[in-house]
Amino acid sequence: MKSARKTAASIVTIVVAALSFGCGDPIPVREMSLARMEITRAESVRADKYAPAELGEARKLLLGTHELIKGDELEKAKQGALDSFAKAREAYEKSLPLLARDTMEIAEKSLGEADEANADMLARDEFEKAQAAFKTAGDSFESKKYYEAYQAALEADKLAKSARNSALGKRAVLKEAIAEVDSVIAEAVKLNARTHSPEKLKTAEESNRAAS
């Protein structure tokens, strides 16, 4: 966060300098802005976790351009900005497939938990959508479309978690209903239902066991 503020302050200073020197001076404002945007792009795919060395170098190079401009070393400043951009792009490309893979693993775990909660029966629509999104993530990853894989995995994880929560809520309601039926069956047994209505009692017991 501090480095981002320093970089922003540096760019503001450089823009002011560019205006004061006039339009003809080759101060690399555009190159520096592109480098800053590429660093932000790398940060968006967790390059701080997956490519910390590359991201750190990109930030360092960009910050260094400020001193170069103050020293009137404009060509070196431009090259520093270009190098910063390249290093940030490297950080992005290194991080994205790793982020996609890890997000797919999280989604797979969420799908497993949804399955354990019987979401395939109690929240079928969301569960099937989660499965479809996870398949899309896998297909995209195999095709090296890592950003699409990452986005699909995020969607699969969200849907799987929602399906699990819906299923758990319905299971609680179902459990209460089963308990009520058990109570009714127990009362019927006391009233000799096994003697008077054995088939009906058997059907009720089997249905309740199936719902359990």
Model-derived segments and spans:
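Long, charged/polar, soluble alpha-helical segments
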Residues: K2-A4, F21-S212
